A protein has these predicted regions:
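Conserved AMP-binding A3 loop
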Residues: 1-22
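AMP-binding/adenylate-forming catalytic core of the ANL superfamily
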Residues: 81, 89, 144, 198, ...
Length: 342
């Protein structure tokens, strides 16, 4: 497989067959997949998530049925769930949102659905709650990297854990550390970079020694590039890619923090915050908002953030409205394409 390529050039990932078998077994146990299960592969199957978490491999291993989706689109996904009596499927947040919008105009019998897995990018708590209510299912958050590590929530977890965390590692042999910029371990509930080693995580990319020198530690931990923290109950929260963190005149801004506040505004249904190159500050803050009934000015957005106690250095420099989000092949919002619109 190739790495996602959302923050750089895709890299070849040397994975073993036994890695995929191991992950499929562990994730089928987490999802209670059995011979009665019907899995809908709604995302492109050349990715870890629909391929084997538990996905196609895990469902077949348990004797269940797999349904393939020709196009990742609500007018393909929702009819298939109804016709094939799908019990489990996986979405990225953007696709989940699009499907829910579609359900406002079209009706389908989705009563067979038991579990919806959501992964691929950060899932905001309000959207997690909405998914459970609209689809009347138990949500399973899943965080994974093509290079190995998989975290998931459990069906028995309470609402707060399912909506606000990405759960725990699937293997008792996964070794996870949260470290600062100097590689020192941070305390519980402190943010840092998630690094990992374990039975199904790679020890380097294929034929890229210069890259491996920067992404593998001396004691063989893989640097995921994800900003995260470990909670007291052992669950993990992932807040985004470290490369997505905006460095504005030396101040660090996490996009998710601003996005969560902006989504509480009555006229904002979907938003992305990205950093743009700036000669004076290094990076400036841009807010992209999906077109709705009313457009807000930059001044209105800034005033709203100030009313929510956002510090001055985190206030955006520009606001731009957009008709539709540019998506990667896996359905993630393509932040690089957003930057190219300026």
């Amino acid at each position: 497989l190739l790495s996602g390529g959302t923050t750089g050039i895709p890299k070849l990932i040397p994975r073993r067959h036994c890695d995929y078998i191991y992950v499929a077994k562990k994730t089928t146990d987490r999802c209670n997949v059995n011979q009665e299960s019907v899995y809908l592969a709604s995302l492109p199957i050349a990715h870890n998530f629909p391929l084997g978490c538990p996905g196609i491999m895990g469902t077949f291993a348990k004797g269940g049925k797999v349904v393939l989706c020709n196009v990742t689109s609500p007018d393909e996904i929702l009819p298939l769930i109804e016709e094939e009596k799908v019990t489990i499927t996986g979405f990225v947040p953007a696709i989940a949102n699009i499907c829910m919008d579609y359900l406002e105009y079209e009706e389908y019998d989705l009563s067979s659905l038991e579990v919806i897995q959501v992964g691929g990018s950060v899932l905001e708590p309000w959207l997690a709650e909405k998914i459970e209510k609209v689809f009347d299912v138990k949500l399973q958050q899943i965080f994974g990297i093509a290079e190995g590590l998989i975290l998931t929530t459990n069906e028995e977890d309470n609402d707060k854990i399912r909506w606000q965390t990405q759960g725990k590692p699937i293997s008792e042999h996964d070794e996870i550390l949260i470290v600062d910029e100097q590689g020192k371990i941070v305390g519980i509930e402190e943010y840092g970079e998630l690094i990992v080693r374990g039975p199904y995580t790679i020890y380097g990319y294929y034929n890229l020694p210069e890259v491996n020198e920067t992404c593998i530690t001396q004691d063989c931990y893989f640097k995921t590039g994800d900003k995260a923290r470990k909670l007291k109950d052992g669950n993990y929260q992932i807040v985004g890619r470290i490369k997505e963190i905006i460095n504005r005149a030396g101040e660090k801004i996490t996009p998710l923090e601003l996005e969560e506040i902006l989504l509480t505004h009555e006229n904002i249904n979907s938003v992305q915050v990205v950093g743009l190159p700036d000669r004076l500050q290094g990076e400036s803050i841009a807010v992209f908002i999906l077109n709705g009934d009313k457009e807000l000015t930059l001044e209105e957005v800034r005033k709203f953030l100030i009313s929510n106690n956002v510090a001055d250095f985190k206030l955006p420099d520009t606001v731009k409205y957009i008709d539709a989000w540019p998506l990667t092949a896996l359905g993630k919002i393509d932040r690089n394409k957003l930057k190219e619109t300026f």
